[in-house]
């Protein structure tokens, strides 16, 4: 299969809309975070006169963009494992249940990472919106809002997968913290 990143945008959008399980909500969420990080990187590059660390901000945004983009495929793989595990016949030894649980743990971990990335991107976007090149403020504000939406969507996916698997742990709480941070950054970006 061709990487989602090697496809034209139109083809990726067609795949999202197709009657297939992936890319779905997780892939769209990761792509949204990647787009937000790209906007931060661009705005930072145009803000060298206003921000002494603009180059570092752009470099960090690029790292987050690349990682978020990788998560598009990782989410599709994780969801594929969930579907494969659910398709297994029930067995007395509980192998299917164990495989379903393991698959759902990974399916929750991927969007959790998305929440963390999105919160970082939103914070960076708010900083660039407030102190960067004023001509790029719209791009920075858009990045912050997109990142906050990505964090919220990813946190919902974490909650769904944790509930479906009856998983314990603190992933939902940590995802909710990332959403709160991303929302606060987006509000800061729009208020500056």
Which residues does each predicted region cover?
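Residue-level recognition of alpha-helical structural elements
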Residues: 24, 28, 50-53, 57, ...
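Amphipathic alpha-helix face/heptad-repeat signature
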Residues: 31-35, 57, 64-71, 107-117, ...
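A structural-propensity feature for long, helix-poor, extended segments
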Residues: 49-88
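Short, hydrophobic/aliphatic alpha-helical segments
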Residues: 4-22
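Conserved phosphate/anionic-ligand binding catalytic regions in large, soluble enzymes, centered on
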Residues: 18-39, 136-153
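C-terminal auxiliary extensions adjacent to catalytic cores
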Residues: 154-192
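Amphipathic alpha-helical interface segments
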Residues: 79-149, 154-155, 161
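Polytopic transmembrane helical bundles with strong interfacial aromatic enrichment
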Residues: 4-7, 31, 124, 161-163, ...
């Amino acid at each position: 299969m061709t990487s989602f990143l090697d496809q034209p945008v139109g083809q990726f959008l067609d795949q999202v809309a197709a009657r297939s399980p992936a890319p779905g909500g997780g892939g769209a969420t990761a792509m949204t975070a990647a787009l937000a990080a790209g906007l931060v990187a661009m705005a930072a590059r145009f803000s060298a006169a206003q921000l002494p660390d603009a180059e570092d901000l752009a470099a960090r945004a690029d790292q987050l963009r690349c990682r978020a983009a990788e998560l598009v495929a990782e989410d599709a793989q994780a969801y594929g494992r969930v579907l494969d595990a659910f398709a297994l016949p029930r067995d007395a030894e509980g192998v299917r249940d164990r495989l379903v649980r393991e698959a759902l743990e990974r399916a929750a971990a991927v969007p959790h990472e998305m929440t963390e990335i999105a919160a970082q991107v939103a914070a960076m976007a708010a900083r660039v919106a407030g102190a960067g090149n004023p001509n790029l403020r719209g791009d920075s504000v858009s990045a912050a809002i997109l990142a906050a939406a990505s964090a919220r969507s990813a946190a919902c996916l974490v909650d769904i997968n944790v509930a479906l698997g009856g998983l314990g742990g603190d992933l939902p709480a940590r995802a909710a913290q990332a959403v709160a941070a991303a929302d606060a950054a987006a509000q800061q970006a729009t208020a500056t």
